[in-house]
Amino acid sequence: MPNPTAAMLVIGDEILSGRTRDANMHFLAQELTGHGIDLREVRIVHDDADAIVAALDALRADHDTVVTSGGIGPTHDDITADAVARAFGVAIDVRDDARAILQAHYDRQGTALNAARLRMARIPEGATLIDNPVSAAPGFSIGNVHVMAGVPAVFQAMVASVLPTLTGGEPLLSQTLRVQRGEGDIAGPL
């Protein structure tokens, strides 16, 4: 039986412009491979709701699991949660449990939970929260889609939270051999 498949959707103008280097794909690939899930596709889209919805619809139809990275922060261009809600045809609003997590976090810091920060408590109807032990603002899962932050430390913590809930197959085992020959010399025997 073949292993389950996964896709990754990286969202952000900062990635496509070269201002920020994506560090999450390599990490996710390693984690999924170790869990017996084959990462088959990665797409990077800009901060545009139509582009996010189109990519998400295609990926979730073709793969067992989709992981998104980016676009769930407090700024005006963080539109991933809205796009995911649109893709699933559900409402989105500030959810009490997400708000309580953020309120407790900002109370501990002595910082106000302002309108911008409250945007991070907007969760599509029917989604379950993904724990964020790094900076509190939760990600969420809906259907076969797991929506995570783009900040690498937060992304990694969210992957650690979600991975045990995914059904894996046979992990890929590999070994590296160093050969002091050019590829053209060894291509035939391979």
Residues of each region from the PLM?
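Short beta->alpha linker loops
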Residues: I44-D47, D97, L118, R181
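Active-site-proximal loop/hinge segments that shape catalytic or ion-binding/gating pockets
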Residues: G12
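N-terminal small/polar loop signature for handling phosphorylated ligands or for N-terminal nucleophile
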Residues: H26-I79, R86, D107
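Glycine- and acidic-residue-enriched helix-capping/strand-helix junction motifs
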Residues: I15-M25
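Extreme N-terminal starter segment of soluble prokaryotic enzymes
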Residues: P2-A7
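A C-terminal functional module that forms or caps the active site or interfaces directly
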Residues: G184-L190
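Short glycine-/aliphatic-rich beta-strand segments at the starts of folded cytosolic domains
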Residues: G168-E183
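Proline/glycine-rich low-complexity loops and linkers
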Residues: D78-G169
